[in-house]
Regions:
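Juxtamembrane/disordered regions of integral membrane proteins
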Residues: 1-137
């Protein structure tokens, strides 16, 4: 691990936490509460350490995979492709699987996928910006 990786990991973690807060804590909050599947907000606070740990792991993996595969190509396109690839690999299937096993409205799932896809594209661009000019030829 080098300094660039640690800085990128921290930045990606912050972006993911803030993005998650905006998407799930604000934009989708009322829809989540209407499902009756979520913990009461007071109870959720007791699980915040697990939420932080999940985002630390996710940000570290996201950064590590990108850093290992970055090429000497334009950073923005590379970052957007990376964000899209991870969204298609993780985000879309997870929400579709949840939709199959949990009684959530179809429009909620569509919004989850759309918002998180946008966030993954943005995070891909962020990590690519941080690693610009660092790729292999």
């Amino acid at each position: 691990m080098n300094k660039k990786f640690l800085v990128a990991w921290l930045v990606v973690f912050i972006v993911m936490m803030l993005g998650g807060l905006v998407i799930h804590g604000m934009l989708l909050h009322d829809e989540y509460m209407a499902t009756g599947l979520m913990r009461p907000e007071a109870e959720q606070e007791g699980f915040m350490a697990w939420m932080v740990l999940a985002h630390v792991v996710m940000a570290g993996a996201f950064t590590w995979i990108y850093a290992r595969g970055v090429e000497n190509k334009p950073w923005l396109g590379q970052g957007l492709r990376f964000g899209l690839a991870l969204a298609l690999f993780c985000t879309v299937p997870i929400y579709l699987i949840y939709y199959c096993v949990q009684p959530v409205p179809e429009m909620l799932v569509i919004r989850q996928i759309a918002y998180d896809l946008i966030m993954m594209l943005f995070v891909g661009a962020v990590v690519a910006f941080l690693y610009r000019g660092q790729g292999r030829a």
